[in-house]
């Protein structure tokens, strides 16, 4: 059984709350030029449609910080400003409406710089994420531990956390990202045992859609199974829409997301008479807008379905130029192969409308 989630401090980010008993939220990051407000808003809107809960944007300069105000006018989810090197960009982002600031303790600079960011965040009532990245750990910490270790990553985070606490600031979120899955898992486990601040989970530089999905599913999924984590981001090279889809699938696979259609399908074999791959892909695409929790099966033959997919709410199983639609393991109707997809989608829509 999945372990009971650790109760962390509740923190408000724009119109969302994280930590405490709040749902685990899916975050992504735009890969547009933040200066280009139109393209950035367009991408965020697409991510919102996919179920993205929080969005982060890069703020490499003042122009990007000023763009936040205009971007915020057109989106519905909280916006996080991603800050590196220049603390003044954090302050400008806060002034222009950012709902949260992410800073990297390894490159933000001196204590007085962080103090100025904290003062601005306090004034606006927004949280700060201490986003540790293994690639930019402080030299003294690397020397102390002889390289990148879970203890080194956590110490870097806690060093900044203690500074924020000393300044009377407690609206803190922590992330501890490395590209090494076991190391990341151990770092989050260690941090979870030491603090009660919300943890943002992710594997940094995870890779392309296939390899990145696997690494993220193992890393994020393992931690969530242990009851650790309050927000997640699946870092993938490519369209960030995939990050949201994979993130939501991870939550759904663990029973932590109780909305949307889950499509299950057989791996196919020599008995298969229908194009399972095409059908399953199309069902997934055309049901992605549905919020009602449903499990839909696409099975290649009557051996795998309906019997082996009887836990599905509805499904199809292929035959010779025809197939069956089944509900909860019982055959509902026989349909010609060319009509299988449309008939299945009609039945799904009926189920969505049912109370």
Swiss-Prot record:
Q: Which InterPro entries match?
A: Dihydropteroate_synth-like_sf, IspG_bac, IspG_bac-typ, NO2/SO3_Rdtase_4Fe4S_sf
Detail which positions bind [4Fe-4S] cluster. Answer: 266, 269, 301, 308
Q: What is its EC number?
A: 1.17.7.3
Listed A to Z, the keywords are: 4Fe-4S, Iron, Iron-sulfur, Isoprene biosynthesis, Metal-binding, Oxidoreductase
How is the cofactor bound, as the UniProt entry phrases it?
Binds 1 [4Fe-4S] cluster.
Q: Which cofactor does it need?
A: [4Fe-4S] cluster
GO molecular function term, any single one = 4-hydroxy-3-methylbut-2-enyl-diphosphate synthase activity (flavodoxin)
Catalysis performed (reactions) = (2E)-4-hydroxy-3-methylbut-2-enyl diphosphate + oxidized [flavodoxin] + H2O + 2 H(+) = 2-C-methyl-D-erythritol 2,4-cyclic diphosphate + reduced [flavodoxin]
- Biological process, per Gene Ontology: isopentenyl diphosphate biosynthetic process, methylerythritol 4-phosphate pathway; terpenoid biosynthetic process
Give the matching SUPFAM superfamilies.
Dihydropteroate synthetase-like, Nitrite and sulphite reductase 4Fe-4S domain-like
Recorded metabolic or biological pathway in which this protein acts: Isoprenoid biosynthesis; isopentenyl diphosphate biosynthesis via DXP pathway; isopentenyl diphosphate from 1-deoxy-D-xylulose 5-phosphate: step 5/6
Q: Which Gene3D superfamilies does the record associate with it?
A: Dihydropteroate synthase-like (3.20.20.20), Sulfite Reductase Hemoprotein, domain 1 (3.30.413.10)
NCBIfam families under this entry? ispG_gcpE, PRK00366.1
Which family does the record claim for this protein?
A: Belongs to the IspG family.
Known HAMAP family for this protein?
IspG
Its job: Converts 2C-methyl-D-erythritol 2,4-cyclodiphosphate (ME-2,4cPP) into 1-hydroxy-2-methyl-2-(E)-butenyl 4-diphosphate.
**What protein name does the entry list?**
4-hydroxy-3-methylbut-2-en-1-yl diphosphate synthase (flavodoxin)
**Highest classification ranks of the organism:** Bacteria, Bacillati, Bacillota, Clostridia, Thermoanaerobacterales
């Amino acid at each position: 059984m999945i372990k009971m989630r650790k109760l962390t401090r509740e923190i408000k980010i724009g119109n969302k709350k994280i930590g405490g008993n709040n749902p685990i939220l899916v975050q992504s990051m735009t890969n547009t030029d933040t200066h280009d407000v139109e393209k950035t808003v367009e991408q965020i809107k697409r991510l919102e449609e996919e179920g993205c809960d929080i969005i982060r944007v890069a703020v490499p300069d003042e122009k990007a910080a000023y763009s936040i105000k205009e971007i915020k006018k057109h989106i519905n989810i909280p916006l996080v400003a991603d800050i590196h090197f220049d603390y003044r960009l954090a302050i400008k982002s806060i002034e222009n409406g950012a709902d949260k600031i992410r800073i990297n303790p390894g490159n933000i600079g001196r204590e007085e710089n962080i103090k100025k960011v904290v003062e601005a965040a306090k004034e606006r009532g927004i949280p700060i994420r201490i986003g540790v990245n293994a690639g930019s750990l402080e030299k003294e910490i690397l020397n102390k531990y002889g390289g990148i270790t879970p203890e080194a990553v956590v110490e870097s985070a806690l060093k900044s956390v203690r500074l924020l606490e000393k300044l009377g600031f407690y609206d803190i979120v922590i992330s501890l990202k490395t590209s090494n899955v076991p190391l990341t898992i151990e770092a989050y486990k260690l941090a979870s045992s030491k603090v009660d601040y919300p943890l943002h989970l992710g594997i940094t530089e995870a890779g392309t859609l296939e390899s990145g999905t696997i690494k993220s599913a193992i890393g994020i999924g393992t931690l969530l199974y242990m009851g650790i984590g309050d927000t997640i981001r699946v870092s993938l090279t490519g369209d960030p829409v995939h990050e949201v889809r994979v993130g939501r699938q991870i939550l759904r696979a663990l029973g932590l997301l109780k909305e949307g259609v889950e499509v299950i399908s057989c791996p196919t074999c020599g008995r298969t008479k229908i194009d399972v791959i095409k059908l399953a892909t199309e069902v997934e695409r055309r049901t992605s807008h549905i919020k009602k929790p449903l499990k839909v099966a696409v099975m290649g033959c009557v051996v795998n379905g309906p019997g082996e997919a009887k836990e599905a709410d509805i499904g199809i199983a292929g035959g010779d130029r025809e197939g069956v639609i089944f509900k909860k393991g019982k055959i509902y109707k026989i349909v010609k192969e060319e009509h299988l997809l449309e008939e299945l989608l009609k039945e799904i829509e009926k189920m969505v409308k049912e109370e």
